[in-house]
UniProtKB/Swiss-Prot annotation:
Numbered residues of crosslink Glycyl lysine isopeptide (Lys-Gly) (interchain with G-Cter in SUMO2): 12
Annotated function: Component of the Nup107-160 subcomplex of the nuclear pore complex (NPC). The Nup107-160 subcomplex is required for the assembly of a functional NPC. The Nup107-160 subcomplex is also required for normal kinetochore microtubule attachment, mitotic progression and chromosome segregation. This subunit plays a role in recruitment of the Nup107-160 subcomplex to the kinetochore. As a component of the GATOR2 complex, functions as an activator of the amino acid-sensing branch of the mTORC1 signaling pathway. The GATOR2 complex indirectly activates mTORC1 through the inhibition of the GATOR1 subcomplex. GATOR2 probably acts as an E3 ubiquitin-protein ligase toward GATOR1. In the presence of abundant amino acids, the GATOR2 complex mediates ubiquitination of the NPRL2 core component of the GATOR1 complex, leading to GATOR1 inactivation. In the absence of amino acids, GATOR2 is inhibited, activating the GATOR1 complex.
Gene name, Swiss-Prot/TrEMBL: SEH1L
Subunit structure: Component of the Nup107-160 subcomplex of the nuclear pore complex (NPC). The Nup107-160 subcomplex includes NUP160, NUP133, NUP107, NUP98, NUP85, NUP43, NUP37, SEH1 and SEC13. The SEH1 subunit appears to be only weakly associated with the Nup107-160 subcomplex. Component of the GATOR2 subcomplex, composed of MIOS, SEC13, SEH1L, WDR24 and WDR59. The GATOR2 complex interacts with CASTOR1 and CASTOR2; the interaction is negatively regulated by arginine. The GATOR2 complex interacts with SESN1, SESN2 and SESN3; the interaction is negatively regulated by amino acids.
SMART domains reported for this sequence: WD40
Protein name: Nucleoporin SEH1
Source organism of the structure: Bos taurus
Keyword match Membrane: yes
Compositionally biased region (Low complexity): 324-342
WD repeat intervals: 10-49, 55-96, 111-152, 160-210, 217-258, 276-315
Length: 360
């Protein structure tokens, strides 16, 4: 049973992203009105806007939370070619603002020459690290060496993807068996379309990221990409939002079967492909156990996908833009359905139209 709560977001333009914090009690939204808003959930379950400020001089494409171990920290990225890191400060006891909080900009990352289309904090076991991707086809990875000083970030890696980048996802696995890994999607729509998803892995010996795999079957523009939480699996699961929803498994090939020293090779299988949205899919998001995938698309619906014990993925629920379930939704979908959804109550936030995310 799903309960829908409509929120008057009060953004002055299209909302591109909605992000929940680790505990799910705080939410951040960003918009083409150049602002970010922070929302807090009250004991009664109502969401209240507790902060709103102009963050960039262009549309804000994405906003994301750091792990709370590092404090209340947000990152945002924009068409203005920058990414920014924000920290919430609580007024000191001798301050007129005692006990009141406000957000301060800790740094602006200005290395990109084009629109910065996504920003993601690395899994916390890697320390305080941040990845950005840009329309110029470069993924940049930054590190804050002193987590108490968020004004100092050093550019550690630049990864050239050869294609305009639209989205990134860190592999969340904290297993020592898995090297740090980042997946990159492209929404490049040029006719000489290459594969739109690349996966890069960190090599301890060279201290650089190297391309491990390319998903050759994904040739349509990719709008979102998400590794599932790992929870001890020996393989990885990757969801992709393109003209439909696709779920891939990546199973590492045993090291002795591959050339030593190079990046891990994977057996890649597509385990589900859903076109039930009958439209572009803009966002995919996993639950905390990596067992349920939510997708949203231009059909105005959020769809929920789950695998059964036979590893067949099914649609287990459909929510319309107003939050109401669609009749018979639990029967719909199979391992070849599709996905799509936007949520008017958050002004198409999950839809996140990428119009103009490139440099003009």
């Amino acid at each position: 049973m799903f309960v829908a709560r409509s929120i008057a977001a009060d953004h002055k333009d299209l909302i591109h992203d909605v992000s929940f914090d680790f505990h799910g009690r705080r939410m951040a939204t960003c918009s083409s009105d150049q602002s970010v808003k922070v929302w807090d959930k009250s004991e009664s379950g109502e969401w209240h806007c507790t902060a709103s400020w102009k963050t960039h001089s262009g549309s804000v494409w994405r906003v994301t939370w750091a792990h709370p171990e590092f404090g209340q920290v947000l990152a945002s990225c924009s068409f203005d070619r920058t990414a920014a890191v924000w920290e919430e400060i609580v007024g000191e006891s001798n301050d007129k603002l005692r006990g009141q909080s406000h957000w301060v900009k800790r740094t602006t990352l200005v290395d990109s020459r084009t629109s910065v289309t996504d920003v993601k904090f690395a899994p916390k076991h890697m320390g305080l690290m941040l990845a950005t991707c840009s329309a110029d086809g470069i993924v940049r990875i930054y590190e804050a060496p002193d987590v108490m000083n968020l004004s100092q970030w050093s550019l550690q890696h630049e990864i050239s993807c050869k294609l305009s980048c639209s989205c990134i996802s860190w592999n969340p696995s904290s297993s020592r068996a898995h090297a740090p890994m980042i997946a990159v999607g492209s929404d490049d729509s040029s006719p000489n379309a290459m594969a739109k998803v690349q996966i890069f892995e960190y090599n301890e010996n060279t201290r650089k990221y190297a391309k491990a795999e390319t998903l050759l079957t994904v040739t349509d523009p990719v709008h979102d990409i998400a590794f599932a939480p790992n929870l001890g699996r020996s393989f990885h699961i990757l969801a992709i939002a393109t003209k439909d929803v696709r779920i891939f498994t990546l199973k590492p090939v045993r090291k002795e079967l591959t050339s030593s020293g190079g990046p891990t090779k994977f057996e890649i299988h597509i385990v589900a492909q859903f076109d039930n949205h009958n439209s572009q899919v803009w966002r995919v998001s996993w639950n905390i156990t990596g067992t349920v995938l939510a997708s949203s698309g231009d059909d105005g619906c959020v769809r929920l996908w789950k695998a059964n014990y036979m590893d067949n993925w099914k649609c287990t629920g459909i929510l319309k833009g107003n939050g109401s379930p669609v009749n018979g939704s639990s029967q719909q979908g199979n391992s070849n359905p599709s996905v799509g959804s936007n949520i008017p109550s958050l002004q198409n936030s999950l839809n996140g139209s990428s119009a103009g995310r490139k440099h003009s």
